Amino acid sequence: MRAASDDHPTQPGNFLRSVIERDLAAGTYAQRRFGGSPGDAAHHAAGPLDGARIRTRFTPEPNGYLHIGHAKSICLNFGLARDYGGVCHLRFDDTNPEKEEQEYVDAIIEAVHWLGFDWQVGGRSHLYYASDYFDFMYRAAEALVGAGLAYVDEQSTEEMRATRGDFNTPGTDSPCRSRTPAENLARLRNMKAGQLGDGAAVLRAKIDMASPNINLRDPALYRIKHATHHSTGDTWCIYPMYDFTHPISDALEHITHSVCTLEFQDHRPFYDWLLATLSAGNFFQLPVPRQYEFSRLNLTYVVMSKRKLREMVESGIVSGWDDPRMPTLV
């Protein structure tokens, strides 16, 4: 335990605190402006200097109830923001309309409050939804296509899996990869207009099919889902993928330290690639967010996967999400 100061609260040390303290000492984010709400570079440039010294976020998907593993992330993100004079945003990753429900949104809000945290700072709420940014994300997707950095792929899921390669074998280019930006833009707009069925095409980034990091082998950015969204209704039939959604949402919200669990460590190069690419196109104000990973909480002999917990509920193995054998925060 170390003595307290403005930049060094009396808290046990860990690498995230060291990163934040280094950034505060260097003034990494001291000159960033905040437009009062999420937005692009021009929006934030018109605002005052950001009064929050750091910005973190907790980003659950509203497809089930939170469990004790999420409590670690909640306490970490909200606690770091509190200890360093910052703000933690609560953002719902609501990009999969087939599995998300308002019931889970309400329960997650209640659970975060139950743990003693809030996203209201100075009379301003920092409760957001990824779906708030669908228009912006689509604009970014069209920009990538126009720059020759994304393309529409009509291969089947099996074909894409076969050409992706593995850890020992490089991937091979899709036959759709060589199309012109104009051709890809027309196909993307057809996707958006609902002219294709579910699974008929995806939008992929054009990076490097021979990359040793499989997540850089032309990852999917958008997929087609004709499903009613809990917030946007039937406005959209294409939805952004997780790896496309999070860096853009972080940048729009001016997050400084994007803290997530270790399974996303090898996704970080794409996170950095996307923000660097879009920043070069003046989408975002510099410096952009940085991603950091921590070890997730696991309990011996306890199922901690939300997907598996959902399967247990739906198959009747347990009586419900509030079954006392479940690790949920209900």
Placement of each model-derived feature along the sequence:
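Basic/polar N-terminal segments that are highly enriched at the extreme N-terminus
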Residues: 1-11
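N-terminal catalytic cores of NTP/NDP-binding nucleotidyl/phosphoryl-transfer enzymes
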Residues: 11-21, 28-106, 228-261
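Residues on a specific face of well-ordered alpha-helices
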Residues: 18, 106, 110, 269-273
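Secondary-structure transition/capping motifs at alpha-helix termini
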Residues: 26, 79-87, 111-122, 251, ...
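Short acidic (Asp/Glu) and glycine-rich catalytic loops that position anionic groups and cofactors
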Residues: 86-89, 116-121, 246-256, 287-290, ...
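Active-site cores that bind ATP or allylic diphosphates and position pyrophosphate for catalysis
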Residues: 90, 96, 102, 129, ...
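A glycine-rich helix N-cap at a beta->alpha junction
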Residues: 104-131, 140-143, 148-151
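Substrate/cofactor-recognition hotspot
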Residues: 296-322, 326-330
